[in-house]
């Protein structure tokens, strides 16, 4: 596996999403996702989880990694939408 420098880490993504929720920049897809509510966010989590499974079964590692990144994004959007912190989740790991 080749080494790469991450553009974002799990923690930095969460910080970015939390900041966008607070500052609500115009035209932000994250703000739109948060405004759509927990039901819509949950549907995206389920959709992305299914795409992760399909990618794991039938697609390349690169495609799988991309699908996992989208699942992590939508999971964090849902967390922010519900007011959870990383620490709330880390307590259960």
From Swiss-Prot:
Pfam families: PRA-PH. One of its GO terms (molecular function) is phosphoribosyl-ATP diphosphatase activity. SUPFAM superfamilies: all-alpha NTP pyrophosphatases. GO terms for biological process: L-histidine biosynthetic process. Pathway: Amino-acid biosynthesis; L-histidine biosynthesis; L-histidine from 5-phospho-alpha-D-ribose 1-diphosphate: step 2/9. The keyword Transcription does not apply. It is an enzyme of class 3 (hydrolase). Keywords: Amino-acid biosynthesis, ATP-binding, Cytoplasm, Histidine biosynthesis, Hydrolase, Nucleotide-binding. Its EC number is 3.6.1.31. HAMAP family: HisE. It catalyses: 1-(5-phospho-beta-D-ribosyl)-ATP + H2O = 1-(5-phospho-beta-D-ribosyl)-5'-AMP + diphosphate + H(+). InterPro entries: HisE, PRib-ATP_PPHydrolase-like. The lineage of its organism: Bacteria, Bacillati, Actinomycetota, Actinomycetes, Mycobacteriales. The gene is hisE. Belongs to the PRA-PH family. This is Phosphoribosyl-ATP pyrophosphatase. It comes from the Bacteria. It comes from Rhodococcus erythropolis (strain PR4 / NBRC 100887). It is found in: Cytoplasm. One of its GO terms (cellular component) is cytoplasm.
């Amino acid at each position: 596996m080749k080494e790469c420098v991450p553009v974002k880490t799990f923690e930095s993504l969460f910080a970015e999403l939390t900041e966008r929720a607070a500052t609500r920049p115009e035209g932000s897809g994250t703000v739109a996702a948060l405004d759509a509510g927990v039901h819509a966010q949950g549907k995206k989590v389920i959709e992305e989880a299914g795409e992760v499974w399909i990618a794991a079964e039938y697609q390349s590692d690169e495609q799988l990694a991309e699908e996992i990144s989208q699942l992590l994004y939508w999971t964090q959007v849902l967390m922010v939408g519900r007011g959870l912190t990383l620490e709330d989740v880390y307590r259960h790991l």
